[in-house]
């Protein structure tokens, strides 16, 4: 008696030449009988009907497959020795169990992937998902069998040309590492390394003609990449026909990016010096062959640039911005201190700094009349202890010379009468005059040439507006300098101060710079050519020199809004002003008819006070009006109105009520 166990699966094709078989459902004890119409080596339709037993004797194969993709495993129940039959059945069951587990694992894996990709409901609702999975697996096996000849051809080609391809890719990786290591090193770094080497050192070779190395690397990279691509394309076309071009393109793109570009260049960036020591000498040898070709290409490219009207740059240089980036990187890495970084950046910016930005204004200048005696000069020196004092005639803005305290000591040692000698007699005349638009860099050079330490600053109309000293110039580089005789008041007068009295309340010296106050309040302070200090900002807000006790409300923009960048401009415009602006009440603490000395900034938390105040008028800084008027001279009034609405964040709301001290 023969039987068959039925299992839903996908297997290879085979046929049984019997019409009816005893079937035993896999994993169950009940049996089925089946009828089918056999056809040699083809799928056969089958009809199954339930029955208890149906014993037949026939010749059969071990397995068969029908159009319903059902697999039958045959077993014998008679005409065999019982012991040998048990062994055969045991081996077959173990083999079939392994196959079943493998197939079920594939099905479960497909189901899990389907759940993650399409969702549980879609996967479970798909009709015939298991059968489809088996079908795909079967097709994959068939495709693999059909592809075996092609794979054999590919392996044959790799065996014949693989070494050539590997050599070309290795050369391409070598050139990529060489290029990155050379370009990563700054020119000044190459010069520094070359000075520490002997005459035949690699960095001396690199410093002598870096263009020669870069040209050789460029030509070598181009040649080996083209050769490798052509080799793979030829082999792929011979194997796959026209489809080989696409296959070769995709393969070489991945290979070149991964093996010859990204990986080698990443190694060279992190080990520039070490890689350069290895690659420079081989590249120098290759340049003997490739560089002549490169020179021809260079001349051709220069001719093209000349035709286009462009000029090439012969030697690389480092811009000021690049140098600042290097300084920031060095500071972050700990190579230099933050103070050192600030000093170097100040040196770079000193050419763009004007004398009027560092001078002492005339109102703060301590000067002496030329008709005063040396006794008066001695008394002034005891009080202020300045080594140099400007000397004026009749009025303070008419400075004629500079009096030195060292000369006063000479008169004392000579025993001359101090009362009978005037300051004008001992003053150094004439004084050195400089325009307020002069750069600090040029002023420092003039101080060195003229061997003077003080100059009188004039405006464009020839009026005296202040003095500038060598100490002022040095302080622009190293920061404020104080000596042991400077009092607390003098230090505050020189640098300004910001004292936080309470939450949101700041007492500010009027000499404090706008940048310093903006950083402390984290607000965007309006800036213009009219003022650079808090005193100028306050006078701009009031429109006149305010008296002690007067107050004004100003609307300032939060600094964080400016830092968000242009991407958030549309979002910012949709926000309410109270979300991005802040009101400050500015009160004058000290001052006189000529200037403001101290100011208090008090944060106002209720932004609605702006709309509720009926006695408040909007004031636009003059420089904003000036910019607006330049846009359209024909519609001046309309442009000014639009500018007032557009720069609401910088508007100053002035309170008409004045508080008297």
From Swiss-Prot:
Residues 154-340 form the CNNM transmembrane domain. CDD domains: CBS_pair_CorC_HlyC_assoc. It comes from the Eukaryota. Residues 1-71 form a transit peptide. Gene3D superfamilies: 3.30.465.10, CBS-domain. Keywords: CBS domain, Chloroplast, Membrane, Plastid, Repeat, Transit peptide, Transmembrane, Transmembrane helix, Transport. Pfam families: CBS (PF00571), CNNM (PF01595), CorC_HlyC (PF03471). Residues 648-661 have a biased composition (Basic and acidic residues). One of its GO terms (molecular function) is flavin adenine dinucleotide binding. PROSITE patterns: CBS, CNNM. Its main location: plastid. Residues 559-578, 628-661 are annotated as: Disordered. GO terms for cellular component: chloroplast envelope; chloroplast membrane; cytosol. The chain crosses the membrane at residues 105-125, 162-182, 213-233, 239-259, 285-305. It is a multi-pass membrane protein. Residues 359-420, 426-484 form the CBS domain. It is found in: Plastid, Chloroplast membrane. Residues 560-570, 630-643 have a biased composition (Acidic residues). This is Putative DUF21 domain-containing protein At3g13070, chloroplastic. It comes from Arabidopsis thaliana.
